[in-house]
Amino acid sequence: MNRLQELHELGQSTWLNYMRRSFLQSGDLRARVAEGIQGLTANAANFEATIAAEADYDEAIWEQVTAGTPAPAIHRALIISDVQVAADYMHTIYQESHGLDGYVSLELDPVLMHDAINTVAEVRHLEAQINRANVMVEVPATPAGIEAVKTLTRDGVSLNITHVFSVDVYERVAQAYIDGLEVFLDTHSVWRFTPTSVVSFSVSAIDEAVDPLLAEKGERDLMGRTAVAQARQLVGRCQSIFSGPRWEKVARRGGRILRPKWSRTTPRNPAYADTYYIEDLICPNTVTTFSLDTLAAFLTHGRVESHVAAWPEQAESHLQRVEELGINLDAIADRLQQEYLRASEQQFQAITRRISRKREELEKAWQRAGVHGTAVHPAIMTELPTQRPAVR
């Protein structure tokens, strides 16, 4: 039994924040699943870097270029294709876990972050296009996003609610989820599977924001502990919300709790152990998310121990000290959400620009081949006899 399998024995699911076409086609995904990975989340930054530096998507981009597809639509088509392939591969896990794991999660265009109506419409559209049961669409936990969570849960859609940096925001999301789940069970449960959703709580970003404030106040002994304390407090809040008569009625009808999903678990501070957040947040009924590097580190030298019973007291003690220092964690959480939402929007724009540049590179290669008869990428050669790109 390896370390991921030990986490499974303790009731924690293990997902990977990585996806690119060669990863899906080469057998690397198969190897990670064999190690114990149970879900995937697409990473926009990695997607852009792959398009820029690798040939994974050249053939697919060229096919879209020759069809006259604009760059934003090319992005969408590439992601949908990857998600479909990954979801098909992960479907066995989805079935064996009875819909708890085996999901592939993809980002929603951040331009919709403050628009509940169009968020709902776009998620429904994506779900229909992808047409896979084990797909989660990521909805940011803005006020509009939380409103959309209620509507989409009512419709039976599984979601990954993102950009959560505080326990209070998790609680608001959880209440919307329960409200939607109750309606779903009253109206749709006879013909649709009950949705399974998670909330991505960003870990390392919190310490990155709080640690400099602690250092300024001479409280270095508190550094690197705030994110873990908040995550542990969130687990306690989750246990409280998903208990009692109201929830028990929902659970008896097949409702599942809104599991916390630990994201950004790679420490930003090199002084912290590379497996620090993974090891300190081992808990049943949660999902922990690995980067490739953190996964390799944890499989090599990670510790698997869980002391959940001590978490409430430890978390309360630390957070009380932080509050006494005048550090406003709610304000920091709000700022982090806004910063990361802006970063997500910029990342999507960067992908569109990157695809446009790649399109130009492929068109120039086509033109050079036509003039000089030089060798070009095989993806282009397959199209040369019959097609010419539509220039936009």
Model-derived regions, located:
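Conserved, mostly hydrophobic/aromatic
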Residues: 43, 106, 137, 152, ...
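Flexible, acidic glycine-rich loops studded with aromatic residues
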Residues: 254-365
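N- or domain-start disorder-to-order transition segments that initiate the globular core
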Residues: 1-27, 387-389
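Conserved N-terminal alpha-helical segment that immediately precedes and caps sugar-phosphate-binding
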Residues: 65-73, 197-207, 212-214, 221, ...
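Catalytic beta/alpha-barrel core
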Residues: 17, 133-142, 157-169
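Active-site-adjacent beta->alpha loops and helix N-cap segments on the catalytic face
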Residues: 23, 115-120, 139-153, 166-178
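Active-site beta->alpha loop and helix N-cap motifs at the rims of alpha/beta catalytic domains
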Residues: 46-47, 53-148
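Catalytic alpha/beta core domains of metabolic enzymes, predominantly
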Residues: 157-293
